[in-house]
Amino acid sequence: MLEQMGIAAKAASYKLALLSSGEKNRVLEKIADELEAQMESILSANVQDVEQARANGLSEAMLDRLTLTPARLKAIADDVRQVCNLADPVGQVIDGGLLDSGLRLERRRVPLGVVGVIYEARPNVTVDVASLCLKTGNAVILRGGKETHRTNSATVRVIQKALKACGLPEAAVQAIDNPDRSLVNEMLRMDKYIDMLIPRGGAGLHKLCREQSTIPVITGGIGVCHIFVDSSADIAPALKIIVNAKTQRPSTCNTVETLLVHQDIAERFLPALSKQMAESGVTLHGDETVMQVLHGPAKLVPLKPEELDNEFLSLDLNVVVVENMDGAITHIREHGTQHSDAILTCDMHNAARFVNEVDSAAVYVNASTRFTDGGQFGLGAEVAVSTQKLHARGPMGLEALTTYKWIGFGDGTIRA
């Protein structure tokens, strides 16, 4: 079954690569329109998935990721339209020039070909990835989690209807709707057909893909994100940033999980933090210093060492007091996932040092980690957030779904 999907996807990718920007945008507009027109069927499938997942004991954080609402689905359709407005990188000449030999050389952006994406309980990924792949002339094979198979199947049917209406092969966007996990292992060996693989899920999925895949893999999306409250931080705006980074949508990978507090500001800052977190319903996981300083009003539990390496994806926040900037940077290097980290400070020398020494895909000064998102970065919907350094890093927009080829123009030109 998967080999036939691969053959069809590869054939579709050749046709997609020839489309003009206008033709690709018309396809995306049709997809957005169909998502809104077929909203009832998608939401009905999603309700069944959510009910089944709840019965299976899925966590509230995962249920939130799984759930679609009319507003969320409308936002997904709007994201597709936003992709239409983005510049098409395909065909762009990156650089080039006339060589001494007389050969005129260009380095030009081209589609990757076929992209494979494995993801868990995130139905929005189906549309986000499909729209970005189509915009860049790539075919895509999707493998969502068993928790979302009804939603994904319904969504892909809508996308394929739009493709067919535009005269394009339905195989340009395909989903593996069989929840059998053995198919993941088979997909990981489809290097004959799939040019790049992107896993979006937990640490176990990423480990499996890194160890078993014969396809180049882009990993990321695991976000043990940190905020360091420097000794010079302005407490009021700092609290506002922390509330946003922790509570806006706790189940996302760009949510802060560990707060590092400079010891010189701890006694003034921690009580204010506790009050704010109590109002926001956040449980604090405090180290020894925090446990000594705080006595409410926020719920406070002792920090377990292993929690420093975990994504809570919930209204829980580690709080650690550090001696200085060195302590904060060392902690992030030991426990961070190179996703998103921030410093809250009024000292621009410290800000510059933090930016230069923290080796993460996104580093912020006096801003929330929640900005690490394709839409927020102006990239449109993202295919993933990469925490590695090759071939992409950070939110993966359109350019991350392209490669390049060298094109030489001559006039009977030969090498001397």
From Swiss-Prot:
Its main location: cytoplasm. One of its GO terms (biological process) is L-proline biosynthetic process. It comes from the Bacteria. It is found in: Cytoplasm. Its EC number is 1.2.1.41. It catalyses: L-glutamate 5-semialdehyde + phosphate + NADP(+) = L-glutamyl 5-phosphate + NADPH + H(+). Pfam families: Aldedh. Keywords: Amino-acid biosynthesis, Cytoplasm, NADP, Oxidoreductase, Proline biosynthesis. One of its GO terms (molecular function) is NADP binding. One of its GO terms (cellular component) is cytoplasm. Pathway: Amino-acid biosynthesis; L-proline biosynthesis; L-glutamate 5-semialdehyde from L-glutamate: step 2/2. Belongs to the gamma-glutamyl phosphate reductase family. Catalyzes the NADPH-dependent reduction of L-glutamate 5-phosphate into L-glutamate 5-semialdehyde and phosphate. The product spontaneously undergoes cyclization to form 1-pyrroline-5-carboxylate. This is Gamma-glutamyl phosphate reductase. It comes from Salmonella newport (strain SL254).
